């Protein structure tokens, strides 16, 4: 009779563990599928930047008080750098500022750079293609 009880405990326990592992596998598969879909939708650069800095584009724009980058112009990047320098210096811990706020300002700049730099590089490449490649080989030309 003790063998029957032990056998039942083992069978019921293995069923419970089997179901738990199956459910955990389903959740892991769904999570990885969702992550692949996010990267496939073109959010790869945005997702990477968001994962590294942990900050959304809206949050970064609010911290530095700039508009969302529309076309990735150099003027937009200059504005970001100007605001960054001012806020970074204002929150210097040696001058009574907050290191936490200073690090938030740095993360906001990094997030905006990750968004603007690829657009600027793409724009420069398009301009090069439009103008053509004109190497300056001779001084008189």
From Swiss-Prot:
Keywords: Membrane, Mitochondrion, Mitochondrion inner membrane, Protein transport, Translocation, Transport. Pfam families: Pam16. It comes from the Eukaryota. Residues 59-117 are annotated as: J-like. It is a peripheral membrane protein. Heterodimer with tim14/pam18. Component of the PAM complex, at least composed of hsp70-5/ssc1, grpe/mge1, tim44, un-4/pam16, pam17 and tim14/pam18. Essential component of the PAM complex, a complex required for the translocation of transit peptide-containing proteins from the inner membrane into the mitochondrial matrix in an ATP-dependent manner. In the complex, it is required to regulate activity of mtHSP70 (hsp70-5) via its interaction with tim14/pam18. May act by positioning tim14/pam18 in juxtaposition to mtHSP70 at the translocon to maximize ATPase stimulation. Belongs to the TIM16/PAM16 family. This is Mitochondrial import inner membrane translocase subunit tim16. The gene is un-4.
């Amino acid at each position: 009779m003790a063998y029957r009880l032990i056998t039942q405990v083992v069978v019921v326990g293995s069923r419970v563990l089997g179901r738990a592992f199956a459910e955990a596998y389903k959740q892991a598969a769904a999570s990885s599928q969702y992550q692949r879909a996010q990267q496939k939708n073109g959010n790869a650069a945005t997702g990477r930047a968001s994962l590294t800095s942990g900050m959304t584009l809206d949050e970064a724009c609010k911290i530095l008080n700039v508009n969302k980058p529309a076309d990735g112009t150099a003027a937009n990047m200059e504005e970001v750098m100007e605001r960054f320098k001012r806020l970074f210096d204002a929150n210097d811990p040696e001058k009574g500022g907050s290191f936490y706020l200073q690090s938030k300002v740095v993360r906001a700049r990094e997030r905006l750079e990750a968004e603007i730099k690829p657009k600027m590089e793409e724009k420069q490449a398009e301009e090069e293609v439009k103008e053509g490649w004109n190497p300056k080989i001779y001084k008189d030309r």
